[in-house]
């Protein structure tokens, strides 16, 4: 009996440790992966199933330029006319974007991409650093604005459908496996160098399965003679709140440690590149009574002296 009890307790502890190491959704469903994945993560299952009838005709991977104005559903055939060339126009110093769409009826085990050189007729080229791309990943959401009124507050969960939507651009992931009957978009950006010579630069996005070329998507960048100043010189005022406390929790590092600052640096760089010039500083503990997942703590030391006066650092 004692052995049975010990065995049962051991199993319970093992299961508890297993789930303690995994992340869970807001409703408590285990995600099957670490609580704080750093390099990559598994997407949640899609509540909607692919249509056997629609996907039956897709026998090989299909790849085309899409539009940046559409969030393509993960398991629904994209409604677009196949396009192997797209043209982007921009000033020197401007960022221009495009979206490529991959959809496949069979598994693609090692989907990856790369850029060719981009040159104009005179031999001028755009630097490799001007281009970057990332897989668009899918996250779970619901019909937040179903009534069109844009209001928050209490609501009946059963009245709002859950769905996967294309949202984050994962620039960390360099290759991925794409299951059969799945759509996988790729976001492409060119930050035209301010030193670029005006003209038309031609190149391509190469989409591969391992080393096998699936499709060459041609891309033209039309560079204007006009110049956009560096983000630090913009008159544009961007003020997005930052949450250092969320960064420390996610990366599991001590607050305000060197590791914490290192984790924040690339995030702050992204904000600066977008024109952010404002730093968020919270003076009191739990302002707004901790409405956010990671409540804000005070960034100022409060000291009450023996004589009843206050000092702040």
For each feature predicted by the language model, list its residue ranges.
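Extended acidic/polar, glycine-enriched regions
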Residues: 89, 101-119, 173-232, 261
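Surface-exposed binding patches on compact interaction domains or structured appendages
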Residues: 23-82, 105-188
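An acidic-aromatic substrate-binding cleft motif
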Residues: 213-304, 308-313
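Short, solvent-exposed loop/linker segments at the N-terminal edge
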Residues: 88-94
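Positively charged n-region of N-terminal signal peptides that target proteins for export
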Residues: 1-4
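Bacterial N-terminal signal peptides
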Residues: 7-16
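Short, polar loop/linker segments at the starts of domains and inter-domain junctions
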Residues: 73-88, 252-258
